[in-house]
Amino acid sequence: MSKVPSLIEELAKPIVDELNLELVDIEFVKEGRNWFLRVYVDTPEGGIDIDQCAQVSERLSLLLDEKDPITQNYYLEVSSPGAERPLKKDADFEKAIGKFIYVKTYKPIKDMKEFQGYLTSYEEHTLVMEVRIKTRKITVTIEQEKIALARLAIDF
């Protein structure tokens, strides 16, 4: 089951590259009785439109029908990663410098496992965030291997 995203990445990447788009993430999840293959794509500058998603969906659907790499029945969804796009690759973190992000860690750091704040730097798989706790700002350094989830967030 965990191999599905990497198999699909091999098929989707050439399609996405040919359309000058970016492959952001792939999920293969079961919700209720149904399986969903979700492919998140974007433009390099951000802001993909529905026609671009449809192009990826049509091409990928044909290729999936031909190669048939997934044994379960599933629904294919191709969409934008949204405003709270995941941060997984080095390039994702580098693009997010200066932006407001949410990070959840596997184990507590400074007695906390969830952080929201501005990403101030990212070097050598380590990120530095400026986090607001009540009325004070603190700097938190988190190694990428300790991150369970990272995504862009909306600052209210």
UniProtKB/Swiss-Prot annotation:
Its main location: cytoplasm. GO terms for cellular component: cytosol. InterPro entries: Ribosome_maturation_RimP, RimP_C, RimP_C_sf, RimP_N, RimP_N_sf. Keywords: Cytoplasm, Ribosome biogenesis. One of its GO terms (biological process) is translation. Pfam families: DUF150_C, RimP_N. It is found in: Cytoplasm. The keyword Transcription does not apply. Belongs to the RimP family. Required for maturation of 30S ribosomal subunits. HAMAP family: RimP. This is Ribosome maturation factor RimP. The gene is rimP.
